[in-house]
Amino acid sequence: IERLNKEKDLIGIFLSAHPLDEWEFEVRKLCNTTAEEMNQFEAWTSPAARNAASASIQENNDEETIEDEKEALTPNQWIEKHAGQPLHMGGIIVAAEDRMSQKGNPWGKYTIEDYTGSYQFSAFGETYLKHAALLKQNAYVYLSGTIQQRGAQFKFFKPKPIEEAEYEFSLQQVQMIKDAQKDLRSI
């Protein structure tokens, strides 16, 4: 992996191989989302951003036939389809930073990379405490979580209509890809 990291640092891409090649089968079979798709979601977390993107997508849909269902969905449709559903992503942790909040609570900021790019996410509270040992640089991990309305984890949360709500990815489970591989073999 050091050789691949040097290669990427020098020319900006992995040329001879990708660090995930050893786990390609597992990543493709177990995962239902990618870094690219999660970054697109991040651009749609606010209602204003979703409305602007929807208008642009609608213009493009009117001008051409969409063959890929993912491209045909507006941001609100994508969120409606995925909110509350399990999302699974596999990759290699390329950056890991353990931090402390102003109140003294530990949390972490991470970047995972797959075949489509990189995605930055955070872990807080019990999720951080439970999984921080796995979320280390160069670890091959399998993430599970859901798309939910921002604040949904709080006791007195009142949901808003999809058109008005802000959304976030809520990390719920982390495991090593090799352990997820065992789950795949048991199917």
PLM feature spans:
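Noncatalytic, beta-rich nucleic-acid-contacting surfaces in large DNA/RNA-processing enzymes
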Residues: 1-187
